[in-house]
Amino acid sequence: MGILQDLEFRGLINQQTDAEGLEQLLEKESVKLYCGFDPTADSLHIGHMLPVLMLRRFQLAGHQPIALVGGGTGMIGDPSGKKAERTLNTKDTVAYYTESIKNQLSNFLEFENVENPATMANNYDWLGNLDVISFLRDIGKNFGLNYMLAKDTVASRLETGISFTEFSYMILQSYDFLNLYQHHNCRLQIGGSDQWGNITAGLELIRKSEEDAKAFGLTIPLVTKSDGTKFGKTEGGAIWLDPEKTTPYEFYQFWINTDDRDVVKYLKYFTFLSHEEILELEKQVAEAPEKRAAQKALGAEMTKLVHGEEALEQAIKISAALFSGSVAELTASEIEQGFKDVPSVERTAEDTVLIDLLVESKISPSKRQAREDVTNGAIYVNGERTQALDYVVTEKDRIEGKFTIIRRGKKKYFLIRY
């Protein structure tokens, strides 16, 4: 099965130019393709995963991806999908973000020791030295104003306002494609569905600049959720690929909590499981949804892909401990991950009567309530129910000397830090 057939099965093709011509080219030779990533933060998030994994899919199929980091365009700002003007970052900030994103991209693509190595590029290398006269004469003259105004990325902003800076973004991205076509023989650009206007503008620039040009564009669908909420966002904010911003446990939990209505689609979109494996999981969703086999497979595949096998094992261990209440088995680093968002309090490492600890740490509102909670068996210290009113929390209750985990009731956790 060819790469395009696989993408069709996975629902990963939104729009494409000259489908027949692209299929023939991909069957005939190893094709260079690119996708751009503007450095708007110091980490990619899961909203970037589809295009990143598309580059990986093409590389696994024998083609040569170019990961383009927008060190130049990142200083301008892409108006696509935005309702208002972006805040411009400083040159130093963009340079820092660029390096961070380049490091992350290297985790997903093979840049050496393969027959079809990926390439990393930074469009600041050619946009940074472009003078205004050359830009207007050699590139700008190829873009009619009516043509640009008709593009969705621009038209959607005309009422709210768009600066010349962001208006010119389409021309700069088009020039990226032309530059990569001329200097790297890059024949295909891929991007999100909101990039269709920019991609077709680039193809038009190539057509006007090069005789007998053969270049192609392909967009991937917008990832949606059945409940109508935005994909990739939680109450805590974006789901980042950087483990310092989103822990592997949080990352794993994001995928594990996928709705039954979305899980098969996400298995197709994001994983490298075979068609047969996905169809089998789809069957399990229909026949035994309570087992959540598809969600577990999705969580495992994605966490392993982004954070590695060891981080996946930790995430599974933390999840199991929180579900069963056996939290004493967790290490200090696992507690940091799993209890990142629970209420916590700093205390000195000294022996304390449990009743006093509950009140002083605001776990129970009063001594009377604390005594009731303990007597009724509602208080757990490191997963163990504690009903003795004179129980003293000592060194033995401090996991690695750093934490004591208090649970009140079935699921209300509190973390004591030392």
Swiss-Prot record:
GO molecular function term, any single one: tyrosine-tRNA ligase activity
GO biological process: tyrosyl-tRNA aminoacylation
Known EC number: 6.1.1.1
Keyword Secreted: no
Motif 'KMSKS' region boundaries: 230-234
CC terms in the record's Gene Ontology section: cytosol
Reaction it catalyzes: tRNA(Tyr) + L-tyrosine + ATP = L-tyrosyl-tRNA(Tyr) + AMP + diphosphate + H(+)
Annotated residues for binding of ATP: K233
Localization in the cell: Cytoplasm
Placement of sequence motif 'HIGH' region: 39-48
CDD domains reported in the protein's UniProt record: S4, Tyr_Trp_RS_core
Positions that bind L-tyrosine: Y34, Y169, Q173
Family label: Belongs to the class-I aminoacyl-tRNA synthetase family. TyrS type 1 subfamily.
Protein task: Catalyzes the attachment of tyrosine to tRNA(Tyr) in a two-step reaction: tyrosine is first activated by ATP to form Tyr-AMP and then transferred to the acceptor end of tRNA(Tyr).
Protein name according to UniProt: Tyrosine--tRNA ligase 1
Organism: Bacillus anthracis
